[in-house]
Structures are given as C-alpha cells and as structure tokens.
Amino acid sequence: MSSAEEQKEEDECKLEFNIFGEFLDDIEHENVGILNPNKAATKKDIDSLLKLIGGFQHWPLLNEDCKIEVVKYLDYPSRCKLERCSRADYEAVKKTPVEVYNVEMIDNETHHYSLSMEPFDNVVVRVQFHHDFNSGKRFELIFSQLGDDTEVRWTQYVPRKRPESRNLILKSCNYYEEAVKFGEKWMKKGNYEMRHLTIEMKNYPFEISQIKFLPRCKSIRVAADDVEMFRWWFQRIPDQLVDLQLLTNFDNRHTWTIPTEFLNAPQIMLTPEFYFWCRAGFTDEQFLNLKANKISFDCVNVTEDGINKYIKNWVSGKGVENFRSALLWSYRNYDESAITRGLELRPWDNNFEEEAAGFCGDFERVCGRGTCYQIYSKIDPYESLTLSLSDDCVAIYGTGKRTEWNGKTYSNYSIP
C-alpha cells in the first residue's frame, strides 16, 4: 500500500471516530457505517426520509418545536440523514435527545481475543439504543493505553467478510479518562434518561464526571471496592429502582462487607429485586423490612431467628408480595432446628417427589440440592415455599402455586 493510501485510510479512521465522538455516526447491526456530516445528502438518503415522513411538501412550514416532535420518532440513521438537509434541520436534530437505553463501562474484560490473545488493560464502552439487545441497535468501543497515547478499537462487520478491527490513536491522553468521557457524552446525548447502567470500573474518575442525576434509571449494576463509590452512584439515581446489582473484586468477595448503615439506602430497601456478589451486613431487622421479592447476597449478620421470622411472615400472609426467592450465601454452620422452629415442614421424601412429578429433579439441576423441605401457607394451603439448606447457602424459593384445571384445585410446583 502506498503512503498516500495509508494516509487516506488513517484519515478515514480519524473521521470515523470524530463522528462517533460528536454523535453523528450511523451505527447499524454488525456494521459500523460511518456518515460524513459535511457531505451533502444523497438522493437515496432523501428518498428514504420522504418515504418515512410522507414527503417534504409541508416540512419547511413546521416550526422548530414541531420538527423536534417528528425527529423523536426517527431512528439514529434517519436523524443523521435529516440533519444534512439544511442548517435548520441540523439544529432540530441536535436539540432532540437520542433514545439511549443502556450504557456500560467495564474495565479489564479478558475476552477480546479478536484483538489480542493476551490480557491487556482496557475499558469497554457499550451503548445500546433499543431494549432488545438482538435488535442490533448498539455499538462497542475498546479503549487501552499505548505509551502516552490512547488506542481506541472497534470491530467493523461487513457482510460475507471476516470482521475487521479498526483503530484510532488519541495523542497524549489517558485511556481510562477518555473512555469515561466518551461514555458520558452518550449519556448526555440521551439527556441522561437511559433505563439501564452498568459501571464496573475500579477507579471511576469522579473528578471529571459530568453526571448530576439519572432521572429514569431503573436498573443499575455497579462494581466497587469501597462504599464511597456505591454512595456516589446512589446519589445520582432515583430511590425506586426495578433491580439493583452490586459486586466487588472477586479477590475481595469474602473479606469486604457492605456496611450495615449503607444498606438502609432506599435504593436497597425498596427495590423489588437485587443481587449482591459480595458480603452485606444486613441485620435481622433490615432483612425483615426488605421489599424485594427476589434477593441474593453473601450473608454476614442475619441470624437463624431472622430467617425463621422471615419464613413465618410469609406463611401467615405478612411476607413480601409475589415472593420468588431469597438466597443467603454463607459457609457458617447454621442451626437447622432454630431456622425451622415452629414451622410445619414436609420433607422431600418419596411421596413428595412422586406428587411433584419431576419438579425435584428439575430443582436439583437448576438450584442444587441440599436438605429440602416444603412449607405451606396458612392463608392458602396450595401455595408453598421450598427451604433448601446446603453447606454454602440457605435458600428459600416460592415454588408451590395454586392451580385450577378441569374443576380441580391442586399445587403446581415450579422454579420461580
């Protein structure tokens, strides 16, 4: 390849990334097709827009507010085409937030084998525009350090060809900070209204962050090794979430504990579903006051009495609504008699396994098999819990459900 051709290819890569950075890129499923915003719209671009919006006959008569309402319904490629038609259209598109559904920033992922067979320090930024991951409306960039510079790589997919890795060098900057700036630019482009957020970065650079509040965030996953990082993110999300995931470095999972006082946060106490891949210092009182119907955490302080009361609350109709599961992970030697005190237990004997018609085998394959009991509701005897006691977990599942068929009522057992 001649030096002129090499320079042309390098310039094209720079143009591509600049357009990424300014949010003027056309990102399609498995094909990063970059558009030049300074290039005039082609007849094909205009025709596709005409078909979508029914023609331009009255378009110039609309004021900017009306145009913005129309632009809200355009997908990102269509916006890129429209903004090239005129300065007024460019301004209308620029002022209309992009619907960003999910943003992920994760450091030191290890499965980038198309780029390197050896592990390397990196930050991955993923942006998804649609709730369905398989829609293809998403992209992924990988940031890494190259001496004093930052290397940005992404994979370009071309039909009927092998994927190609594209790259760009950003001079004299830190890859970690550049990745965060890029991810936060996409949040800003979506008016900070994405529904989901994943942050798995050991040293998120708070000092350069532009995030003030994420008003519509309903699902967040954060990895941290100190409570202040969790606290920083909690200050920027609503009290009421749909689900919450907190985790720590794998090496610290069995030593570092989320403090008891922090667990009083409404994002934890009110969420209907949470998973903590770390130790959590819940007291019995906090555990009993949780609103979640599906929980999992490494248990430190919850006692046998707390677990016993939790089950009794459900049995008497005072438990959380639509309970699904509670997994308390611990290698502590719990006193089984204290956990089950005052409860009517049905062991998983041959009679139960025959009645449950294959459920026990399915349960063992999916959930593991410790010492299992079925515990029935006093409000509705066709509803029941499964209590499974093993060496590393006290697991409670809502497995028995009232079912009516052909005029008969019975318990149907299934894994929630």
Could you say what each language-model-derived stretch is?
Residues 1-416:
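Non-core capping and flanking segments associated with repeat-based/extracellular domains
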